[in-house]
Amino acid sequence: MAYTQTATTSALLDTVRGNNSLVNDLAKRRLYDTAVEEFNARDRRPKVNFSKVISEEQTLIATRAYPEFQITFYNTQNAVHSLAGGLRSLELEYLMMQIPYGSLTYDIGGNFASHLFKGRAYVHCCMPNLDVRDIMRHEGQKDSIELYLSRLERGGKTVPNFQKEAFDRYAEIPEDAVCHNTFQTCEHQPMQQSGRVYAIALHSIYDIPADEFGAALLRKNVHTCYAAFHFSENLLLEDSYVNLDEINACFSRDGDKLTFSFASESTLNYCHSYSNILKYVCKTYFPASNREVYMKEFLVTRVNTWFCKFSRIDTFLLYKGVAHKSVDSEQFYTAMEDAWHYKKTLAMCNSERILLEDSSSVNYWFPKMRDMVIVPLFDISLETSKRTRKEVLVSKDFVFTVLNHIRTYQAKALTYANVLSFVESIRSRVIINGVTARSEWDVDKSLLQSLSMTFYLHTKLAVLKDDLLISKFSLGSKTVCQHVWDEISLAFGNAFPSVKERLLNRKLIRVAGDALEIRVPDLYVTFHDRLVTEYKASVDMPALDIRKKMEETEVMYNALSELSVLRESDKFDVDVFSQMCQSLEVDPMTAAKVIVAVMSNESGLTLTFERPTEANVALALQDQEKASEGALVVTSREVEEPSMKGSMARGELQLAGLAGDHPESSYSRNEEIESLEQFHMATADSLIRKQMSSIVYTGPIKVQQMKNFIDSLVASLSAAVSNLVKILKDTAAIDLETRQKFGVLDVASRKWLIKPTAKSHAWGVVETHARKYHVALLEYDEQGVVTCDDWRRVAVSSESVVYSDMAKLRTLRRLLRNGEPHVSSAKVVLVDGVPGCGKTKEILSRVNFDEDLILVPGKQAAEMIRRRANSSGIIVATKDNVKTVDSFMMNFGKSTRCQFKRLFIDEGLMLHTGCVNFLVAMSLCEIAYVYGDTQQIPYINRVSGFPYPAHFAKLEVDEVETRRTTLRCPADVTHYLNRRYEGFVMSTSSVKKSVSQEMVGGAAVINPISKPLHGKILTFTQSDKEALLSRGYSDVHTVHEVQGETYSDVSLVRLTPTPVSIIAGDSPHVLVALSRHTCSLKYYTVVMDPLVSIIRDLEKLSSYLLDMYKVDAGTQXQLQIDSVFKGSNLFVAAPKTGDISDMQFYYDKCLPGNSTMMNNFDAVTMRLTDISLNVKDCILDMSKSVAAPKDQIKPLTPMVRTAAEMPRQTGLLENLVAMIKRNFNAPELSGIIDIENTASLVVDKFFDSYLLKEKRKPNKNVSLFSRESLNRWLEKQEQVTIGQLADFDFVDLPAVDQYRHMIKAQPKQKLDTSIQTEYPALQTIVYHSKKINAIFGPLFSELTRQLLDSVDSSRFLFFTRKTPAQIEDFFGDLDSHVPMDVLELDISKYDKSQNEFHCAVEYEIWRRLGFEDFLGEVWKQGHRKTTLKDYTAGIKTCIWYQRKSGDVTTFIGNTVIIAACLASMLPMEKIIKGAFCGDDSLLYFPKGCEFPDVQHSANLMWNFEAKLFKKQYGYFCGRYVIHHDRGCIVYYDPLKLISKLGAKHIKDWEHLEEFRRSLCDVAVSLNNCAYYTQLDDAVREVHKTAPPGSFVYKSLVKFLSDKVLFRSLFIDGSSC
């Protein structure tokens, strides 16, 4: 132990001394990486060459003043005023950076040669020749152009491409590039210029009269003018000479003449008007007309150059409230003089105007006046007796040092000579030991004598003042003034005979105060400017013509009367109905009668839309002759189909019942298909159909069900073939999960490009050398698949359902008679039995195997029945009388027996109703018994997007028999069954209590070692099943997979903490889960849910009730009280009460146990202990496994204890864990999807649901790359981003499939108790480089803007840059008296669940909005197979698809995906309100709307682990949406707010104050306590244990509103 301690101490000392090589290497690597990043950042800035020779100090001045540029100093050109001349090019580039590239720009007095060299063909220079020097300067610019062209010619080069347009413009039309008129008289006329016009003025506004400047800008329609000029604040002090030290220049003023020159050089001077420059400096408003004015704003001062901009302002846009009636004084006097015979009141009326006023003030800071005082100096001429006085600025410290020192002199020593000697001594330098010690004060030596005189007089007067105070203002016969002048005369003698008179006249000495004044100057001087303009514009609101609308309403009246018999007629969309009838020329009364018949299922036809809406019915009733191409035509006539043999010869195969160019009723099913070989080499296009949802079914309901079943087989086959064709087209873009299901064979090399997991596939899709695609039935020999010469590749699928679909289609098509299925006249009996009632046992007891037939859905069930039937040793059940449904249909007609007396179908309700009807007809039976359970899981449509109307799901039967005695279920489960079934359910089981539940702390607790599970393991979701299998559990199935099975003991597990829609009180999945066991069931769950409540209720049952099997529940009624207030939100100020303990108590009640977790060192523990991780393919740089040590500042310690964690340090282990839990943990739930066609259908629903009808088609006249769109994007960007865009050469695109990976240092707090058992992974950020964002950012910004402008904002809110107040306004018109269903779709792992289908949907939306095809393809390739690199942690990996969290489309892409997902699953035409934000959604539907199985649809189509949750109040983006009688109020989640108060990353008190302000902004609505009761109900919906919380809401308001009190929530961590 001692040796270990010694070794540790020695290693630590070596590290401190720098002897640890590993630490030194890491530090060097970190230093190197930092240097590389810094240099790369500098390289992205615009480059400017500085050729003039300047000093090192001047180099530093230029670099610091213009950090936006990467300046290269060559020092190759000696010139006069080198720094100022070189800075002029920087100033020009800085001004041009403010202007959008390509916008028409006027350069006032500019250098046209500079613009030519930069290739700016959009700049026009106004260069008037105001003097000879201007002519010389213009000729010099021409010389520079000639010199440049001669160099190119000498080198055999041509003008570069970026300069060619500008040089061509100057060569062909030189007056377009430059003119020699003043800007006020410029005659340049732009040709076809669109967009805004800009101007720049670089050191040229001196010569433009300020009063003409605004009108000149307006004449050229200039939107903004940017200007730069030399100036100094000291010119405002009326100094006659001012130095500009940085550029070694100076201003000198003589009256109104202001001269600018460079010091230490023999150069020409520049003369300007001082008063004119002063107007530019001090004025704010520059009127241009009686309506418009240009407003000046200073931007920045750099190296003695002032930058400002002049913005064009339309005064008519001022709010009319600033207008007031006032009298124009000049107009008043004019009216009085010209019209004395009028009354005075008439003159007043003539002069009265409606005026708009505005004012501004500008402060000028005089930095050189800091610590300075103004000292008066005076002098007199002995010859002329002319008196002069001036004031100088002298160091305050110098003045009072002198005054304090000489004040100590005795009366005899206080002489002018002594004072001058002392002042000279402290100003002079001293040499000590050969080293010069300079004076502390740099005072001009020429002023020392005058200053000494002032100091002397000031001190003399101070002495006399002291004597006066001592003598109580009485000094004898002489007055104080006389004493003063006696002393002065004695001191000076006859040298200054008129000193007294001079001092009095100049007020140097104030006799009344007996003091000499030394003033302290103001550091700021304020200049005011005022704008007064006359209000002239007046616009009247046009009247609305409603006569046409009223006439249309009268026409629709009779039709609406017919529709009033519908159950939900009050929700009928009259506008849509009338528009559709008018555009399609459908009679409204006819359409109304058909709608009533269709909605009542009495029409004899079915429109397989999601809902038979008004618009779809009108479309179906459209006249056949006027139907557009592809529209539906309802006809009863038979159309002959060409011979099947002829179709096969052409490689085409017509599928039955699939909508396309022909309606379903026009098909005449051919009976020539005898075997599956006739499918061989059918073209893939003939099997792929798109418009599956536009089929019209006619005939009796059984016939319609049978047609729908045929179409479902075709749709399944179509989707599978489409996916195989897609794989053949793009083999390289297949992700790892897809590779496990499919295979691709290269015929030429006889090698599998993608090796399938299974072998001997019966079918596949063939790609020929002509790039044609055919379905082929495969054969095998010794070498593998038998191929043809024209075959290029073969794609196969491991899913055998396609082969069975082909076989079943072949059989069913043979059964059709004239295109119509035959309906059997056999009696159909439904045996509805409760779970465990012995349905299989009853079948075996009733069946006669010699003449009856048993059909079951699965192979295992068929083998089980045969085994039980033959258990006596006598073989009675064979494959001829006990079959699976698929086997019977595929091999129909091949067995010896074709007719059966009775048909028994086990679990028949799990089959498609049309399939059941076919089975009855094919068996030729007399009576059919269909055994099933109406309350258990029904048939699930596995083909995403295929229509299966609700009334098709009801099996048409002649008789229903019930079985209400369960042989399996214990008594407590039987008690639950009585709630679900009509009639009394009895049980024969001797077990009374069998169910129990256990709340586990988190998903990590469930593992085979610490939590072995007893019996059969079941889960609700596939993701939970996969999680258990990955942890080592075996024989795990979902509830749906074991329906009909029986087990002695069951362990039911739920690992998903988010709501699951199938776990509900009336869910069939819950019923199946509770009824699988005979002895015991234990439910392990991480969250409270309805099943826990059910089990707890069953655990409390008494033996008496279990013996009775009886449920007696009363009807609950709710008292309703009408609202008292109407209108807007009632506001009641919340009292500021409570203490810290209130917040702690509330948090502990809502999340018990979280505050007791000691998690400050969890990250350290994970790094120091052994850990085992399962990762996908990646590359790890183990040299990054030990992070470089950093000096960490101890943060403030919170007083409120929450589950918040300390900030993590990024490193290989942390980043890898985050990547495993995020990017490597994507679910796989989706079924068979025809990706391209289904995506197209989904996008159709998206546009129909959310976009206004008139904006559903993109505006082709608007370019996404317009100047306006670029301007809008640039306004949102920082200067650094714009600089990177300017540095990018645009020659080629960067690698769009390369991403960087990083993690957020602060873990995200969860509002649950999972922190007690899990180590939360950090959030990952996957992002592109800035160059890619700069390319696609403006593009997607414009696409987003177009999308949001097209959304129906009255019903839908896409939450982008919205405030809580805007959310309240959106939901404010909800009527609380109307019953509503509040729905939330909760999705786990939203970003990582997105796969190829999501990308296809999103790209299709962007494409329809106008996304250019080439860039769209580039963007698509960059989001398929992508490479992630984490340089900090040393990790590199590859992922497929997934949403990139740092992408330019992350937020809007997630928003449109969630909206598209909901539009594909829910009836959006009935929605009241809907809001979407990222993965959050909130929907308001009328009460009682029917919704599909959202989890099923989300799993199969969207790969989402989604749950549709019904609530009383909405929860959206961390806020509770409380709708009430007066409108809506949005409260920030108080529990989330308290959780943030436990933050452990607050650095210091300043950071804490910023944190408080941010919390105040989001929690401002808590100041209103009027709706605290509703907030309590909303919180209790989410957190069941939450107490009434008004006390804690008030406490939050109290602490957040007081910055001092808020500091008490934290203590200094360094003092702990």
From Swiss-Prot:
Domain RdRp catalytic as annotated: residue spans: 1380-1493
Residue ranges occupied by any Alphavirus-like MT domain in the UniProt entry: 72-281
Domain (+)RNA virus helicase ATP-binding, chain residue ranges per copy: 801-963
Keyword Nucleotide-binding on entry: yes
Entry's Gene Ontology BP terms: DNA-templated transcription; mRNA modification; RNA processing; symbiont-mediated suppression of host innate immune response; viral RNA genome replication
Binding residue positions for ATP: G833, V834, P835, G836, C837, G838, K839, T840
Annotated (+)RNA virus helicase C-terminal domain residues: 964-1116
Keywords, in A-Z order: ATP-binding, Helicase, Host-virus interaction, Hydrolase, Inhibition of host innate immune response by virus, Nucleotide-binding, Nucleotidyltransferase, RNA suppression of termination, RNA-directed RNA polymerase, Suppressor of RNA silencing, Transferase, Viral immunoevasion, Viral RNA replication
Classification via SUPFAM superfamilies: DNA/RNA polymerases, P-loop containing nucleoside triphosphate hydrolases
Family matches, as CDD domains: Virgaviridae_RdRp
Database matches in Pfam families: RdRP_2, ToMV_Hel_N, Viral_helicase1, Vmethyltransf
GO MF term list: ATP binding; ATP hydrolysis activity; mRNA methyltransferase activity; RNA binding; RNA helicase activity; RNA-directed RNA polymerase activity
Top-level taxonomic group: Viruses
Family: Belongs to the ssRNA positive-strand viruses RNA-directed RNA polymerase family.
Protein name per Swiss-Prot or TrEMBL: Replicase large subunit
Organism: Tobacco mosaic virus (strain OM) (TMV)
